[in-house]
Design a protein with these regions (language model features):
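Helical lid/core segments from catalytic subdomains that handle acyl or acyl-like groups
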Residues: 1-56
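Intrinsically disordered, low-complexity linker/stalk segments enriched in A/P/T/S
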Residues: 4, 17, 58, 70-73, ...
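A generic structural micro-environment signature
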Residues: 10-12, 56-59, 83-85, 103, ...
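C-terminal functional regions of eukaryotic proteins
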Residues: 26-27, 51, 75-80, 107-122
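Flexible, Gly/Pro-enriched loop and linker segments at secondary-structure and domain junctions
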Residues: 43-85
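C-terminal structured interaction module
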Residues: 86-124
Length: 124
């Protein structure tokens, strides 16, 4: 397990190349939370934590926040294994947010955009 800061790029090929370079350059003896600590020190919370469990299909995920006073100021997401259901490829995507900064309309918009993107790439 390791936290990596991967900058957003509109162009997927550029995003993938940078993500691949960052992920494959993780030191074995490094601090798995080093990137997160640096961001916190800088006051930069413009992040989304995304975990992937590609070998597991799930119906729900529960997150435990161990740090006292942590209001969870960033979304926690988990993507799971894609499976075939009724001739369609589906996968679980869980998101945990603090209602102090995210409303239901934000979640509706987010999942709507995910659905649009998946429809777009499924027709390529």
């Amino acid at each position: 397990f390791y936290t990596v800061r991967i900058p957003y790029h509109e162009d997927f090929e550029r995003f993938y190349a940078e993500a691949h370079a960052l992920i494959t350059d993780i030191p074995e003896d490094g601090d798995p939370y080093g990137a997160e600590k640096i961001l916190a020190e800088q006051g930069d919370y413009d992040v989304v934590h995304l975990s992937a469990v590609p070998k597991m299909y799930f119906t729900s995920i529960t997150y435990t926040l161990a740090e006292a006073g942590n209001g969870c100021s960033y979304p926690l997401m988990t993507a799971g294994k894609a499976v075939s259901r009724e001739g369609r490829l589906v996968f679980p995507l869980s998101i945990y947010v603090n209602h102090a900064f995210v409303d239901g309309s934000h979640l509706t918009s987010f999942f709507g955009k995910v659905e649009e993107y998946l429809k777009e790439i499924s027709h390529k």
